[in-house]
Amino acid sequence: MSDTEAKRNPPHSYREVSRIVCHVHHRLSRHLGERLVELGARSVLIEPGRTVRQLRRPRPFGLPGKVVRLEDQPAEVFTAVVDRDEAEAVMHDIIATAELNLPGRGTIYSQGLVEYRRPAQRDGQSDPSQTAPPVSPTRTEAPGVALLRDLALITCILSMSGSGEQLARVALDLGTCVPVVTLGTGTGLRDRLGLLRITVPPDKEIVQLVVPAYDAEGIMRILIDEGNLTQPGRGFVYQTPVRAGMIDTRLRIGAQEHAASIEQIIAAIDELKAGTAWRKRFVGLAGDETDEALRLPRDNREISVICTEGRAETLVEAAIEAGAGGATTSRVRRLSSIDIEGRIAARERSTISVPASICERVVSALLEAARDSDDIADRIEVLDSPAAFTHTT
């Protein structure tokens, strides 16, 4: 549910927070992790993934033109939850620590959401994750860095093997951003197909793109078309808002032929224009609802459930019984191998996209399922999703 809905009719206790997501090359992950520990950030999750860029090289034997292929690089995706008034200070600290203002170092963004946490333990002790000290960044603003405001996150959850690489190629050809690809396991439509389920593999590729908000729907329509998402079982795509962020603009790897790279020029213009509106290209696609096959349902919600490893199935079943169409579950881990309660830090995160009309019912079902055990669910996060698409809609 949205912030307004939660305030008007809250079924359980909640708090408004910011989710900061940062993906960097795996060689930077240790340094960034140490800094997050120093900051005192709570609920930090790490997920392995890969970034995709274009590698351009001259053709051999002096032939004209260039050879272009995709280059994968290992990455770590950090997710931290902080108070909303601390979010930008933490982001600037992370940017300065990992030098994310330099092209090729990584991407960072924050999203505003409503968080439901599990209640206090039955023995009367408080939940340490709720009483953790506030984050205390030492840098309130990275020098020469201006966060972009007009951004959106596009999440594509794909069923077919190799489709993640295909959509990453499309995103790079469009010059949107550096795609980040992670893995997950799907539950929902496939389980209802009977014998036809063998045609839809359970493993999913999750492609995430941080793009200018002005072009988000136009890019979504192109991805739907290129990924054949109008066919059943191929996957789905949805959009969520980004409050602030900094995008990695190094889409291509190759020899630099000029005094400044195109990535440096784009970053400089973004700073001068104080946003990405000047990049808008898909003027006629954003509001095009004439093609019924590509109609984007409005007013949706993304529900994320973070739980102890092995417990996601119970929660997903409760969500499906409450009306959710399915879920995608990924394996993540806490920042340390043992969390502050002495439990193993392995976690599962299930992502569920639902219409706003049933969001409250699904959240209530999840909280009810988690009530039977103190350690089944760490928290539930609810985020607005202004546009979504799946074949079943």
Task: Annotate each language-model stretch with its function.
Residues 2-393:
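Positively charged, small/polar-rich N-terminal and surface patches that mediate targeting and assembly
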